[in-house]
Amino acid sequence: MVPATFLENMQIKKVRVEKKSRKLTVVVSSFSSNAQKLSEFQSFLEESFPSLKEIKIVVESPSLSTVEEVLENWEKVVLELSEEYPSSLSFLKTCDVAKEGQNRITVKAPTYAIYEMAKSSKLDFAIREFLRNRYELNLDVELIFSEEGEEIAEKIIEEDIKAIEEVIQKDEKSKKEKSRSEENRVLLGKEMKAKPISIKDVSAETDEVVIEGEIFSIDFKELKSKVLMVFDITDYTSSILVKTFLTEEKYEILKDEIDVGTFVRLRGNVIYDKYEGDLVIDLKDLELIPPKKRMDLSEEKRVELHLHTQMSTLDAVPSATEVIKRAAEWGHKAVAITDHAVVQAFPEAMEASREYGVKVIYGMEGYMVDDGIPIVTGESEASLEGEFVVFDIETTGLSNINDEIIEIGAVKIKNKKIVDTFETFVNPQIPISSFITKLTGIDESMVKDAPLIEEVLPKFLEFAKGAVLVAHNANFDVSFIKSKAKKLGLTVENTVLDTLELSRHLYQDLKNYKLDTLAEFFEVKLLHHHRAVEDAKATAEIFIKMLEKLQEIGIKSVSEINSVLMEREVDVKKLPVYHVTILVKDQKGLRNLYEIISRSNLEFFHRTPRIPKSLLVKMREGLIIGSACEQGEVFRALVSNLEEKKLEDIINFYDYLEIQPVGNNEFLIERGEVRSVEELKEINRKIYELGKKYNKLVVATGDVHFLDPWDDVYRKILMAGKGYKDADRQPPLYFRTTEEMLMEFEYLGEEAAREVVIENPNKIAEIVEDVKPIPEGTFPPVIEGAEEELRRITLEKAHEIYGDPLPPIVQERLDRELNAIINNGYAVMYVIAQKLVSKSLQDGYLVGSRGSVGSSLVATMSGITEVNPLPPHYVCPKCKHSEFVTDGSFGCGVDMPDKYCPNCGTLMKKDGFDIPFEVFMGFEGDKEPDIDLNFSGEYQPIAHRYTEELFGKGHVFRAGTIGTLADKTAYGYVKKYFEERNLTVHKSEIKRLTMGCTGIKRTTGQHPGGVMVVPKDKSIYDFTPIQRPADAEDTDVITTHFDYHSLSGKLLKLDILGHDDPTVIRMLEDLTGVNARKIPLDDKKTMSLFTSVEALGIDPEELGTPVGTLGLPEFGTKFVRQMLIETRPTTFDELVRISGLSHGTDVWLNNAQDIIREGIATLKEVIAARDDIMLYLISKGMDKKLSFKIMENVRKGKGVTQEEIEEMKKHGVPDWFIQSCQKIKYMFPKAHAVAYVIMAFRIAYFKVYYPEAFYATYFTVRADDFNLDIVLGGKESIKRAIKEIEAKGNNATPKEKNLLTVLEVALEMYLRGIKFTNVDLYRSDAEKFLITEEGLLPPLNSLEGVGIQAAKAIAQERENGKFISIEDFRNRTRVSKTVIEILKQYGCLEDLPESNQLSLF
């Protein structure tokens, strides 16, 4: 009897009972009861008829045929719509609906924020589709928002913004901008009443438009009488460029009113701009409007505990700063950072946390593998000779809740022999998909007459009674059997053995443990894989062989298997992966997390860094472990409907459980893993209930990958770039406000929703301590007695050169430097660098210094650099008499005339490049020195190993880098995305999306030579995790996980770089016997190369250049050769200045070059190196510290401030000097330029006096760009090739441009009378050009297509005797057919017969 309370206001239209399947369907009239009443009625029926398998209430819809009928029944339409679109209920309850014409309705949201949420949820589309599908009513539905309601919302937003401003202490400019945007204000033209259209709807057919949005790029270009204002604007549907000309007066107003981030409404004409090649808006009217931003208006705020930044490789969009800034704007007190398997956002998050006052919960979403899965589940004491039932099932799908068994196959084993079989189809009473039919070969015709599971399962359990159940991946098969048994009131008490887990422990060398892999390994036939009977038989045969193996290792019973085998380490690289959220509770937890990450990368990496569960258990102190997303253990267990005991074990591992919006996981419906949105909700309800049952906090998390709903387009682009076919079906992984999250979980009930959304996440945030990802302070390594050793080495060398006592100028300089270096704790750096350089020199390799280390006399005297920073001076090598020239008459000592010692008559040494120490370490000596050293590329690995010897293994790591999407790569991703979809968008939209994708992490790498040194009393895990670069598994290189910039000032970084110059010098010394360090730097012939080719004895016309610097490092490029032609340097000092000018950015072009051409200043007066700025300003009487600060800012491209300009003018600094400072983006220190020029000059000396050695060395180093075909053709062949490449201009490929440089040097060599000979199989070296009487003999690897390994193989094998045939050559060298064909082509094998066999005729 149905109670009267249910029958009130309800009309039961129809009742249908299916006896065979025990299903009841009740059809009731639509709108007869609300959702709660229907739910209560459903519960009543389920309690009244417990034997029924399924009870369904179907609501019959009345006919709605007009707009009026829809409006009349709107409240009930909303209720019915909310069953399909749950989130719509909260939206639509607050909205008004109205008729607009015959077939149109408007749904008015009370505020813009609700309108935005409804729009992003595509609610208009949902209503339209619902009315069409349910009532066959085609209506247009438009979402609008109430201006009156918006005013109220705006006031709340304004108050919230003001409160946030106070908390995060915005600067005055920011406050001005905020106040300006609080109300609409006309800036140009007149006020606009017309309704704005979406930018995506702007087309060539559009004439005058009104649009509104956010400016994301702006530029003012000053012309003769007007200013061109150009800006890009977006409303997140698309973007467009806007242009207008302004008067000077309007420009002065607007430049302070609008900027990037300003929201405006505007009107203008849509025109095609030929210059832009796109539609633009010619601006007429412009109005400031309040920012249209999502805000969190809830009094109590949530905390997001699962969020990804752009450090999740090509997967998430926002930077850590953007996330934390948004949390601050919304009033959230904390936010978690949980990137995929990395913590590389931590350093940035730490800085942003300080700036915005938001607590960062540091964490990570890891990839966990359960390395403790038991092989046997249950208590059986059975002997290995006992009974086992090996079985397999086929099903309609993966869910044991929604899917059914369609076949069971089983084999009984006793005494390791098959004694019985069981096989049957099962009628599932639901359709079998084409996918399952294709997989298993089972279709509906094969099962339609089969028995039901109710009949089959008891028989199977009887067959298996008392036996150990055996299956491959038993979790799946057994969970199905137990789930169906439970529905039938049956129990399954058998012990279970999983052959998948057993094989992992017994046969660890297999590539994987799939059934077909095992069958192949054991030579077992598997004829019809994915048929239960065949799979069971194959598994049984495999299992019998495994039983034999178990007995071999001494196992006699089933109960021993776990205890013996689980002691063995399983290969975690072959285990299934689950996601896990790991949050850091305290500093100890942070260190543990760093070690977990490091070990997961170094020991357990396979496609991703894997974390064994046992490792996490061992190191979980100070960590809070969460169950993560749908790829987490808990969610997977519920989808698989695991039995309660296993579920309990899984849940008890976690500190808290996560539930996420159903939209995040709707893709599981498409995959067939769950049936409906309702089932996803049910899983979340179940997780909530389990949390209550096992006393675990349950938190609602967003799995955030982008900030706003419309930002999903960035992730679509990223996913498409990675090749995902479903890239456009993005789940709504945006950062939700408290209201949005409460709305998502309203189905849990108001109290439970508040608990999971607000209370529990805040509880976790409260127990998390303030953690520092990188410790405060500096942690230099310690070398006992470093201070004394540095002082000793320095003074010994100084006395050796300048005598004892030292000249006052030397003594004062050394005292000042040593005090600064030692007192600031930098002696260790110097001692390390000294040891490295000393070892390299002992091993026969010169070391070039880089950067400003040459500014330090201590560095010179300790042997770190050859650059002497003292003023120009003479010093007698015999009696130590010295004379210093401090009147500025010479730029460097090398340029002074020769002079003999007045005391003993010995020719004095000339030295000194006049470089102030302050450039290196500041006036207080507290600027951290950066010692960069150029080692030979051949020697660099040895230098790295020596560093490890000095500090110990585990204390020296390569400096890590993070490779992000550069703007050009990001542009390529965006363009490709739209091209693949045949979509055309405005160039501004391409620009916006490119900007949004730029900076997202793509890979990791290593600094070319940087190493980080950890002091012996510290662990690397106190600072950073470690890993291999670019996830490479085949390298021994270990880098810091954090980008090395993040560790700057914390750990010592040594730059041990590889460079060609020391390699070149070493080869030249070996070929000539000349000691490069003794080459005179004032050699006249060598100096002449920088202005003419006279010393080379060739015609400049034929060479194509009037200077002789081809092939010289730093001076051989076309750009620098042109500088030499313009400046005509005759002194070493001028070469140093040219080096500085040529290596900077915007230092020569459009700057010094114009100043010299216009006669404003000379080469000696322009800014050529950063030192020039500081020294010139000091000479003008400016404060030393301010001069140093200006130099530092200018060399970094920051220019000078207005206040600094006024100070410079006050001291008589000319305008050209100030303007030059403003243009510079980057520039060399003088010491760097000096070191480069010294190396280049030495190589130039060899070019003049040892031409064969010079060219042999040059081409050896540039062998990759060599083309033997062209050069063997002689001068004319080379000239033709040069002309062809030059004719291509900018269209020449990088390879052709590199070849051009090589060909120019080759032409010069021919003009000097030196030729190339052909490659010789027996005489050519593997990789070096050799000097012979006939000319230069190219190496084997100079042949295009013959790699270095093939060349070495040939060179090595010919040492074992001559080749007797091509067959013999092939067999002995093992080179490819291609290499043999290339050697034949060049005549290298012409004397060899094809075969070893002799012919008698």
From Swiss-Prot:
One of its GO terms (biological process) is DNA-templated DNA replication. GO terms for molecular function: 3'-5' exonuclease activity; DNA binding; DNA-directed DNA polymerase activity. It is found in: Cytoplasm. InterPro entries: DNA_pol3_alpha_NTPase_dom, DNA_pol3_finger, DNA_PolC-like_N_II, DnaE2/DnaE/PolC, DNAPol_HHH, DnaQ, Exonuclease_RNaseT/DNA_pol3, NA-bd_OB-fold. Its EC number is 2.7.7.7. It comes from the Bacteria. SMART domains: EXOIII, POLIIIAc. Residues 388-543 form the Exonuclease domain. It is an enzyme of class 2 (transferase). It catalyses: DNA(n) + a 2'-deoxyribonucleoside 5'-triphosphate = DNA(n+1) + diphosphate. The keyword Coiled coil does not apply. GO terms for cellular component: cytoplasm. Keywords: Cytoplasm, DNA replication, DNA-directed DNA polymerase, Exonuclease, Hydrolase, Nuclease, Nucleotidyltransferase, Transferase. HAMAP family: DNApol_PolC. Belongs to the DNA polymerase type-C family. PolC subfamily. Required for replicative DNA synthesis. This DNA polymerase also exhibits 3' to 5' exonuclease activity. This is DNA polymerase III PolC-type. The lineage of its organism: Bacteria, Bacillati, Bacillota, Clostridia, Thermoanaerobacterales.
